[in-house]
Amino acid sequence: MMNPSKRKLLYSGKVKSMYETDEPGFLIAEFRDDTTAFDGEKHEKLARKGVINNQINAHIMQALKDAGILTHFESVLSPNESLVRRLKMIPLECVVRNIAAGSLCRRLGIESGLRLNPPLYELFLKNDALHDPMINENHALSFGWATQAQLDRMKELSFKINNVLFALFSNVNLILVDAKYEFGVSNDEIYLGDEISPDSCRIWDAKTKEPLDKDRFRKDMGRVVESYEEIAHRFQIKLS
C-alpha cells in the first residue's frame, strides 16, 4: 500500500483540500471540519465532521469498488485524509433521486417524500457563482463540458451506483433519498470522484424519516455531527 508524502496544496474547496504527493497520479484529500450550504453562503466549522465524512466516504467507496465500479479512492491515510487517484474532472454534477425532496419539490411543486419510480436522473453544471444550474445533455455538448460517450457513461454509472448504495443503506435501516455524483477521467476511463457522505446525499432514517444529512445544517435543525455519527454507527465504522 502506498504511503505518499504530502506536497503542495493544489486546491482548497468548500470542505476539502487537495494536495499533491510524491506519487505521480495520486493526491491526498483532506476532509476539513468546514460545513457549508447555499453554495457557500452559510458556513460553520463543526468539530470532527471531517473525520466522520472521511471514514464514511471510505466505507462507501470501498463498497462501490467491491461492486466493480471505478472510484478515485485508494486508501485512508489518517483520520481525516485519504489517498485518491488524480482525475481530470468533468464539471457536471449527476444527481439521482429516489424520493422527492429539496430543490425538486420547489421546482415542480411536488410534496416531499414522494417515491420516484423509476429513480430520477438530473444534470447540473458545477458552478457556485451560478448556483449550480440544472442543464441537459445538449448544453453539455454545445459548451464542450462533456462528450456524448462521457454523458452516457456517467448516466449509466450513476444508476449503478444508486442501486448499490440504495441497498447498502437499506441494510442498515436508512433511506438514500438522493445523491450527487461527480466523475473524472484517468487513462480514458471514467471514475467516480469527489466524495459520498452525508454532505453529498440526503439520508433519512427508514422508520422515522428523520434527516441525518446536511439538511440538518441547511435548516438549522441541530445535531449535525451527531447525525453523521449515527450513520457511521449504523455502518459499524470505528471512528478514529
From Swiss-Prot:
Top EC category: ligase
Reaction(s) catalysed (UniProt annotation): 5-amino-1-(5-phospho-D-ribosyl)imidazole-4-carboxylate + L-aspartate + ATP = (2S)-2-[5-amino-1-(5-phospho-beta-D-ribosyl)imidazole-4-carboxamido]succinate + ADP + phosphate + 2 H(+)
UniProt keyword annotations, A-Z: ATP-binding, Ligase, Nucleotide-binding, Purine biosynthesis
Record-annotated disulphide pairs: none
Keyword DNA-binding part of the UniProt annotation: no
EC number: 6.3.2.6
GO MF term (any one): ATP binding
Gene Ontology BP, a term: cobalamin biosynthetic process
Family annotation (InterPro entries): SAICAR_synt/ADE2_N (IPR028923), SAICAR_synt_PurC (IPR033934), SAICAR_synth (IPR001636), SAICAR_synthetase (IPR050089), SAICAR_synthetase_CS (IPR018236)
GO cellular component, as recorded: cytosol
Alphabetized Pfam families for the sequence: SAICAR_synt (PF01259)
The keyword Nucleotide-binding appears for this protein: yes
Biological pathway: Purine metabolism; IMP biosynthesis via de novo pathway; 5-amino-1-(5-phospho-D-ribosyl)imidazole-4-carboxamide from 5-amino-1-(5-phospho-D-ribosyl)imidazole-4-carboxylate: step 1/2
Family: Belongs to the SAICAR synthetase family.
PANTHER family the UniProt entry points to: MULTIFUNCTIONAL PROTEIN ADE2, SI:DKEY-6E2.2
Protein name in UniProt: Phosphoribosylaminoimidazole-succinocarboxamide synthase
